[in-house]
Amino acid sequence: MSESSVLIVFPNQLFKNHPGLKAEIKKIVIVEDSLFFGDISFQSNFHKQKLWLHRASMKNYASWLKGKGFEVHYQEHSKKSDVLFSVLKKLKSEKSLKLISCETHDYELNRRLRNHTHKLSLKLEILSSPMFLNTQEQNSDYRNGKKRWFMADFYKFQRKRLDLLMDGDQPLGGKWSYDEDNRKKVPKNLHSEIPKLSTFRRSATEQEAVEYINLNYSSNLGKLEDLIYPTTHSAAKKWLDDFLNNRFSLFGDYEDAILKGENWLWHSVLTPVLNIGLITPEEVIGAAKKKAHDNNVPINSVEGFIRQIIGWREFMRATYVDCLLYTSPS
């Protein structure tokens, strides 16, 4: 890699093992991109808790990188200008010759990144991302020649490809899906035993994010109360462990249950930390496999959870890329 290579990190790329960290980079620029905070062209009134999660997790990531010895620059969001273009223009003026980034997993962000770097004559290298288990090439190879595009078919392909819950070439237990066993109502005798989500003592960084969002996004939806989401790699790992230890075994039975006054029941609530990169699907699957093996977790819980990660999540990403449709970052 060139000495003047710069790694750019977006809000959904906070990977502990970011592939760009292995490169010979001059510095790292973390960008509060407008597509995640508020964009002029794609106007969205993002919930304050989403904005808080991005701000706090990105600030924590910057501190973590500095602790690793990297030179880190943090670019805040601007409501009036194209922050990404401004960052790239500055890098160009500093004689940065090459920009390194992970796959963005967002059509519009990818389009802008490529257009801006081309306009500024900046070399751009896109690295594979650990955000998903499948590569685009694997999904395309599977998709080619298929007359129909159903999640159930894709899920079987995934189970076989990843050798998960398989007995030879057949599904473990004799069924590909235990969805019919995931629709029980929560009995009254369990109402008082629904596990509570673990909580964290909020850090100074997280409190700064509360004040910053309230000050700069006061008219946005929501309130910054009862904040539950992890904002560091270690907290995300504890969040996963809490699910596996306290909710995993009954997840299958009550996966589709709805109970007034209960927001979480036995769900993992891993989507936010997965979607910003604080934890990866590979880590989640590895930990779930070990927990299931060591503790004889019911197969309807194991299969139901695995299906969400390797099935639905990967299928929706493949569908998004295949259709080339724009949706706002989640």
Please report, for each region that a protein language model flagged, where it lies by residue:
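Short alpha-helical segments and helix-capping/turn motifs at coil-helix boundaries
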Residues: 10-17, 84-89, 111-112, 257, ...
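Conserved small/polar residues in nucleotide/adenosyl-binding loops
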Residues: 326-330
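N-terminal beta-strand-loop-alpha-helix module at the start
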Residues: 2-73
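Beta-rich, aromatic/charged-enriched effector core domains that present basic-aromatic interfaces
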Residues: 83-229
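Conserved alpha-helical segments that form or flank metal/cofactor-binding pockets of metalloenzymes
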Residues: 310-324
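Flexible loop/turn segments at secondary-structure boundaries
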Residues: 15-17, 36-38, 81-82, 107-109, ...
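Glycine/tryptophan-enriched, flexible segments
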Residues: 162-305
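Short beta->alpha junction loops
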Residues: 74-82
